[in-house]
Amino acid sequence: MTNLDIFLIDYEIYKANPNWWLDITEIFLKPGLIFKASFNNEHTNILEKISAYGSDLSISFEKNVLGVEGIINEEMIRDFKASYKVKNGDGIDYYSPFISLEIGENYCSAHHGSELYLSNLSEDELEKIYKIINPLDQYLKFDIS
């Protein structure tokens, strides 16, 4: 099994492929997996959306950051992909609405999508990820172990 860390080093990646983060994240979005997400507490609309998917959520609050933990379902995946868009603030692109996002045991996104930590990747997952990141290598730094 392989571990792959991906770091965004050039925000011009948006011009080459604005959906690179979602394309990688989709590989790991599977119903039944546990997710953990954190986001700024002023983004209560995110909490409202996530809460609509079920009552089996755990919600925490710490230093202006809301945390949510729950189980991914088909409706959540469909809506997440349909509503996805990159937001720009202060000259920085935010690829994820979440400060951090963990999916299952293999996926962690940090700093609004500018860092990805992928662990225990199968050959199939690694091949899919390489198809996404190889054309973008000038915008990303990656470490493999």
Pin down the residues of each PLM region.
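Structured alpha/beta or helical-core interaction and ligand-binding surfaces enriched in interleaved
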Residues: 1-145
